[in-house]
Structure formats: structure tokens, C-alpha cells
Design a protein with these regions (language model features):
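Active-site His/acidic residue clusters
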Residues: 52-57, 100-123, 210, 236-280
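Internal helix-turn-beta structural module
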Residues: 299-363
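Anion-binding catalytic surfaces of enzymes that hydrolyze or transfer phosphate/sulfate esters
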Residues: 172, 177-267
Length: 370
């Protein structure tokens, strides 16, 4: 599948959404995830808590803040910087939300996970046109004030004393307005009911706009210590009633951003043995090769969001491998799941909505693009 380096673009693309029609940045999606209703002129932005060290951006996630810590800091920022126009909302861990009423979305922003170890001042948000200059100035002011406030916060002083990275600045990016997304149940008649299982706000927001129910799994963290077994069981249970179940695991992406090869390998093994294997065994307890749930045949697809090579520590815009196991599919010659082997797969390179239409058993239009 042809992917985009932007997570929010690709995650919608695999569900069949045309990025040119529905793209509004990840901010509005994360707003939907945490239940923030946006007015038409509300600019919603992902708001990372990051660690700056001198002139460099040291860590886009502050060494993985606990959500409780992030909540303390976001409430503190809302108390001191919030206004009728500006509102800070708590998300998950280091991933939070900034909403600017009447904000202009035409900004040039760099995701902080793209610039670890780089001079942060070179990547500060800028206006893409004259109309957005007021919004850009406001964001720069909020960032400057956040550095002043967070540096002296007791929580950060405690983190420094314990040898942890302080969350000493906000970093807004991924801004946009409320998107117009048609529910999947209207696009695909086969889907009467669907669900999504994830710990990540972005995916939860996409799920809400796509008309999917959100399944919460205790112990799902969005990191390598997530509850793989719990996600597997939740998927097995959901397949008794739902026509589509979207299970997302963030662990390998985070390991890639950390540049940690052993950890990334471990997350892949855990995905295989602790998530995929239990699901397949539950759907085919006799080992017949025929997957079933609630007396109906089941198709399973496995694919990553996008590459996050450990040596680059950021996303790349490269085709990603995928595998589909479904009734009636003739196996091809590919025996391993990796980028090189997948190039020889029977499906070739799929683009746009061709993946979801292939998976759903629908012939993609000849002109489908993405």
C-alpha cells in the first residue's frame, strides 16, 4: 500500500477516505477522541508536551509522561494562559490539545517527533499566509509563556531531581477544523456495525468520525507495555456482533521514534505472539484454516501505519507491506511479512481506497487514487 508519512492521513486512507477531501490535520480528530465539540471556526491543534535542552529539542514525549502528570501541567497552563479564545485540554500522556477560537489553520508547523536532537527555534510555527499571522504570533506567545511557567513547576523540578526529562514546553502542530467524514456504514453496505480498539487519541477520533464505536481496554497504554492480550480478547468479543473491527497498536512506532532496535523487534514479536496468534486461534480453534465468528467467515488484514525506521527516528513516505487472509483467496508465493517480500505479492501496489475495497471484497474503480 502506498502510504503517507503523516499518520493521520494514512490511518484515514486505509479506511477509504480521500485525504484531499477530508484532511484537516490531526488536532480535530484528537478533539473528537476526548469529547471536545468544535465550533466551525475553532482551530484544534495537537499540543505535545516536549523536553527542550538548550537550543535542541531533546525529546518529543518527555520520556513518556504519565497521563496524570500531563493532566497536572495542562490544567496549570489553562489556569495561567487560558482565555475565551484559548483553551488547553488534557489528552493522553504527552499528547494533548490546544483549541484557538477563530484561529487560522494556514500555518507551517513541524511535528516534534520529526526533529529530535535538532535546533528547535528553526522549526517554530510560522504563518503560511498573511491572514494567519495573528494566529502564528499567538501560538509563539503561548509557547514562550509555557517555557517560563513549566520550567518552575514543582512536577518538573521533581522529574529533574529524579533524572527524568522535564516537560518544559508545549509544541502545537497538526491544526485544522472539524472534518466532514462520511460514516463507513454509508460507504460500505456490508458494515452495519463496526468498532475500533486503540489507546491513541488520533485513532479514537478517526473512529468516532467514521461512525465506529470505541472499545476501551484496561491496560492499553499506546506503548510497548500495552495489554496485547486484552486487545486480542476485545477483538474476539467484538467480532461476535461487529462487521468490522479495527485493532491498532502503537508500540512499534514509538520504539522507532526512540531509535531502539531491540525494543522494536520485541514489539513486533509481541504483536505476533500475544495479539495476532490468540485472535487466529480463537477464530479457528480446530486449525482448519477457516476463520469464523458468530457462524460467519472472517477476513483478517495485517499492516503497519507507515515506516518509522530506527536509524531516522521519524516517519518515511514508503510503501508498506500488508497481508490479507480471507475465504476464497488463493495464496501467492510470498512466505514472509516484510517490505522486500511484499513487493512480489499478488496484489501489487495499491493506492487510495483500493486497499479497503480489496479487503471488503469490492472491485476498486480503475481510476482510484490516493
Amino acid at each position: 500500500v502506498r502510504s503517507s508519512a503523516a499518520s493521520d492521513v494514512y490511518k484515514r486512507q486505509i479506511l477509504g477516505y480521500d485525504q484531499h477531501l477530508v484532511y484537516e490535520g490531526r488536532g480535530p480528530l484528537e478533539a473528537a477522541s476526548i469529547g471536545v465539540e468544535l465550533a466551525p471556526d475553532d482551530l484544534a491543534m495537537r499540543c505535545n508536551l516536549v523536553c527542550l535542552e538548550g537550543d535542541l529539542l531533546k525529546n518529543h514525549s518527555c520520556g513518556r509522561l504519565e497521563t496524570e502528570e500531563g493532566d497536572v501541567l495542562m490544567r496549570y497552563l489553562q489556569e495561567h494562559l487560558g482565555s475565551e479564545r484559548v483553551h488547553f485540554y488534557t489528552g493522553v500522556q504527552y499528547r494533548h490539545l490546544l483549541v484557538i477560537k477563530g484561529g487560522n489553520k494556514h500555518l507551517l508547523c513541524t511535528p516534534p517527533h520529526d526533529i529530535p536532537g535538532k535546533p528547535w527555534r528553526e522549526y517554530l510555527p510560522k504563518a503560511a499566509d498573511e491572514a494567519a499571522e495573528d494566529t502564528a504570533r499567538l501560538i509563539l506567545h503561548l509557547m514562550e509563556e509555557s517555557r517560563r511557567l513549566l520550567a518552575a513547576h514543582p512536577l518538573n523540578l521533581g522529574r529533574v531531581a529524579q533524572g527524568q526529562d522535564p516537560a518544559n514546553s508545549i509544541w502545537p502542530w497538526g491544526g485544522g477544523y472539524r472534518p466532514m467524514m462520511t460514516p463507513l456504514t454509508q460507504t460500505f453496505p456490508q458494515i452495519k456495525r463496526g468498532s475500533v480498539i486503540t489507546a491513541v487519541d488520533l485513532i479514537r477520533g478517526i473512529g468516532r468520525y467514521a461512525g465506529l464505536r470505541i472499545i476501551d481496554v484496561p491496560g492499553a497504554t499506546g506503548l510497548w507495555d500495552t495489554n496485547y492480550e486484552g486487545k486480542a480478547q476485545a477483538a474476539i468479543d467484538a467480532l461476535q456482533t461487529d462487521d468490522l473491527v479495527y485493532v491498532h497498536v502503537e508500540a512499534s512506532d514509538e520504539a522507532g521514534h526512540d531509535g531502539n532496535i531491540p525494543l522494536k523487534l520485541d514489539t513486533i514479536r509481541s504483536l505476533d505472539s500475544r495479539l495476532l496468534k490468540p485472535i487466529l486461534e480463537a477464530l479457528d480453534p480446530e486449525g482448519t484454516g477457516c476463520l469464523q465468528a458468530a457462524g460467519e467467515p472472517v477476513a483478517v488484514a495485517l499492516l503497519p501505519d507507515h515506516p518509522t525506521p530506527c536509524h531516522l527516528r521519524t516517519h518515511t513516505n514508503e510503501p508498506i507491506p500488508f497481508a490479507i487472509y480471507a475465504p476464497g483467496i488463493e495464496p501467492d508465493s510470498v512466505l514472509t511479512f516484510d517490505e522486500e517480500a511484499a513487493r512480489e505479492g499478488a496484489y501489487g501496489l495499491l493506492q487510495g481506497d483500493e486497499f479497503i475495497r480489496t479487503f471488503m471484497g469490492i472491485t476498486a474503480p480503475a481510476a482510484a487514487q490516493g
